[in-house]
Regions:
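Short beta-strand/loop segment that forms part of the nucleotide-sugar
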Residues: 35-45, 67-69
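Glycine-rich, basic loop-to-helix element that forms the pyrophosphate-binding segment
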Residues: 69-86
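Conserved donor NDP-sugar-binding/catalytic core segment of glycosyltransferases
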Residues: 99, 103-132
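Catalytic donor/gating beta->alpha subdomain of glycosyltransferases that bind UDP-sugars
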Residues: 166-170, 175-227
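Membrane-embedded multi-pass helical conduit in multi-pass membrane proteins
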Residues: 236-321
Length: 325
């Protein structure tokens, strides 16, 4: 294995300092491959907080460069600052919460060398700590590894080619960057990367998670033209089908109950049909595709899943209506 000089960039806020300390403690074998750690911490608005974050430098023998800001800065800007301050040829990213596998960097370097790549995108897996978290994760992320910025290892010249992160978004900047990277360097997306583990939802209740879900979806960087067209097509199909159902017995069967074309309760049938399609896809097919063991759920747990899924879908609809262009 060829020696590589790697900078680890971590963005955080002061409120998450205890999680940042836990992350640094659990870098384990990954430290062998790191030349420096760049921590960008915002919300450091007092002298005592400055003292507290500087104690991070004493946790490891490796060079830890701490950059602090009084105001809270967005995740994209935090990463951009870390990139500019980094000194080495390769950059890898972590966030405060997901914890990396102890052989994460070794595994990623192996993939780079075997496939002659300039970078690999990170992956993350969500692990619940209670039944509510299990239902929420099953309704959203699922249990298959999903691509993400944390865990990414990339050559700096490729990063410069792809471009930096959108600095002023509270969320969605990572999705935008991944979409951009897929166009410029699709080989960044590789199977076999050891995923970071996101254990639990850090004590957030359902209301907090709904607010975060709305914030993420309303700021999510998507292709608004294609997404709007898809919504338009589905809406057009459903509306036309319902209008046809409402007028079928009137226009086709002339309300003659003896007619071959008369369909009793056709409106209720069509509404029930679309509801059934939604239910089967959203509550069964989609979770299975995300490696959720849906058939292991008991009745109460399944009802919770249905409730959470419907609420989140309504939030997603509202977020789409209010989508920030």
């Amino acid at each position: 294995m060829i020696k590589k000089e790697i900078s680890l960039v971590i963005g955080s806020i002061y409120e998450d300092l205890k999680y940042l300390k836990e992350l640094i403690k659990k870098l384990n074998n990954n430290l062998t491959f790191l030349s420096e750690i760049v921590c960008v911490i915002s919300g450091v608005d007092s002298f005592q907080k400055s003292i507290n974050i500087n104690k991070l430098k004493d946790m490891l023998d490796i060079d830890i460069n701490i950059i602090s800001y009084e105001k809270i800065i967005m995740p994209g800007e935090s990463r951009n600052i870390g990139i500019r301050k980094s000194k080495y040829e390769y950059i890898c990213f972590l966030d405060t919460y997901p914890l990396p596998d102890e052989d994460w960097i070794f595994n990623s370097i192996t993939i780079l060398e075997e496939k002659n790549l300039k970078g690999v995108l990170g992956q993350v897996e969500y692990k619940p700590t209670n039944e509510f978290e299990d239902c929420f994760i099953s309704s959203t992320y699922g249990y298959r590894p999903i691509y993400c910025v944390p865990g990414t290892l990339i050559k700096k010249n490729l990063l410069n080619e792809i471009g930096y992160f959108v600095p002023n978004r509270r969320s969605g900047e990572d999705v935008e960057w991944m979409n951009r990277s897929k166009l410029i360097y699709p080989n960044l997306f590789q199977d076999g990367v050891l995923p970071c583990k996101y254990s639990g939802l850090k004590g957030k209740n359902f209301i907090d998670l709904c607010k975060k879900w709305y914030s993420y979806k309303v700021s999510e960087t998507i292709n608004p033209i294609f997404y709007s067209q898809r919504i338009l097509y589905y809406s057009f199909l459903i509306i036309c089908t319902l209008l046809l159902a409402l007028s079928w017995n009137d226009k086709i069967a002339n309300w003659d109950q003896n007619s071959f074309f008369y369909v009793p309760h056709i409106s209720k049938f069509m509404v029930s049909f679309f509801a059934l399609i939604y239910f089967i896809y959203r509550m069964i097919i989609l979770p299975i595709k995300k490696k959720v063991k849906i058939f292991d759920f008991n009745l109460i747990k399944f009802i919770k899943l249905v409730y959470i899924s419907i609420i989140l879908d309504l939030i997603k609809l509202i977020a789409f209506i209010n989508h920030k262009k």
